[in-house]
């Protein structure tokens, strides 16, 4: 997402940095500290970043002042990205419709299928003696979960991944001039056909359910939900999965702890999301004049809320740059906060927990490939590894 530099508000006295200059690739802890140390409000590439925890949480909790709808309207998406591109009361309606399908109780019914898929993917990788954990595990599994939730055939997985990659790359272009939009049109057609099929032949999948009932989604809303899942629900889980497996590869004692006490996997997963939220920035636009730390932001000011920065701000014993394994699940904002808190957080936890558990059962000891340096591509909107080469003894 970009902001037109010519129309950004110019506010005197605000320190300015450049996003691409932050030292994020090798160590996000250092990068976020540079941002926090610059001041409570920092201008970067047309966006005003709020860096203090209280200010970020206040913005998340007050959509009447910090609008998600305005932020996503600025993208010019032809589809309403349900529910994130709406503010209350419209957003409240969508959450009421969708929340039951992503509750722990509902997801529990899907656990056997999702667990078996995790086992199949992990066993295929474990048999090789080495793998790229991103390509072999972290990329395919979330895509299969999406297809399962929407009642779509798993054979479409590789097509879905290709469409997802192409559409995300497309969204990063400032204009569509000279850009191949074929993948976006193909994904649009694929989801449209799926919606039409569900209207004719209802199943037990989520897509079928949201298309029926007194307050069902219309076709455009269902398409927007599908697009949001593909654009925001796949790479985020992929990235968190990579971060989890990287940390385990670097920490033999942690592997032992989790194998001996699988209940601690839940603590570990929350720590990974706290430290390495894959979508670390939340965009908002002000709806009226707002004053933050003495800085007056006029209406329509583009604002970014750095979730990862406040999770590591040192304001308490657990808000550190290290994994805290004290047996407790600690509060954090890796999934956002306020009414727009991540709808799929329970699903993401389930996916991450399944992969970590099944991997440790089959590959108790593993290490990073010699000479490989764990850096993420930066600058980027989603933080995650491109590759993760692991070495271990084959269990074939």
Annotated model-derived regions:
Residues 1-396:
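Cytochrome P450
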């Amino acid at each position: 997402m970009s902001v037109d530099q010519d129309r950004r508000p110019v506010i005197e006295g605000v320190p300015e940095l450049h996003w691409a200059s932050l030292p994020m690739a090798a160590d996000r802890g250092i990068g976020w500290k540079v941002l926090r140390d610059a001041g409570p409000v920092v201008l970067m590439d047309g966006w005003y970043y709020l860096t203090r925890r209280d200010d970020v949480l206040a913005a998340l909790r007050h959509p009447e002042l910090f609008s998600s709808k305005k932020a996503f309207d600025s993208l010019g998406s032809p589809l309403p990205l349900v529910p994130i591109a709406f503010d209350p009361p419209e957003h409240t309606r969508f959450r009421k419709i969708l929340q039951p399908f992503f509750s722990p109780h509902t997801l529990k019914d899907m656990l056997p299928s999702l667990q078996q898929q995790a086992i199949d993917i992990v066993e295929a990788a474990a048999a090789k003696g080495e793998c790229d954990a991103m390509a072999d595990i972290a990329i395919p599994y979330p895509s299969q979960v999406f297809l399962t939730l929407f009642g779509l055939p798993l054979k479409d997985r590789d097509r879905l991944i290709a469409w997802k990659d192409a559409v995300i790359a497309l969204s990063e272009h400032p204009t569509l001039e000279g850009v191949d939009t074929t993948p976006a049109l193909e994904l649009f057609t694929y989801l449209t056909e799926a919606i039409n099929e569900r209207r004719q032949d209802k199943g037990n999948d989520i897509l079928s359910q949201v298309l029926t009932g007194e307050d069902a989604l219309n076709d455009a809303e269902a398409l927007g939900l599908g697009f949001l899942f593909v654009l925001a629900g796949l790479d985020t889980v992929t990235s968190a999965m990579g971060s989890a497996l990287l940390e385990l590869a670097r920490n033999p004692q942690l592997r032992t702890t989790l194998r001996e006490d699988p209940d601690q996997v839940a603590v570990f997963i929350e720590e990974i999301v706290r430290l390495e939220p894959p979508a670390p920035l939340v965009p908002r636009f002000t709806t009226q004049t707002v004053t933050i730390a003495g800085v007056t932001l006029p209406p329509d000011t583009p604002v970014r809320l750095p979730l990862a920065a406040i999770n590591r701000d040192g304001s308490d014993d657990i808000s550190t740059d290290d994994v805290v394994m004290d047996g407790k699940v600690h509060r954090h904002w890796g999934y956002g906060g306020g009414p727009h808190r991540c709808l799929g957080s329970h699903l993401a936890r389930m996916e991450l927990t399944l992969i970590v558990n099944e991997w440790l059962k089959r590959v108790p000891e593993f290490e990073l490939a010699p000479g490989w340096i764990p850096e993420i591509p930066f600058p980027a909107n989603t933080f995650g590894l491109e590759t993760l080469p692991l070495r271990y003894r084959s269990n074939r």
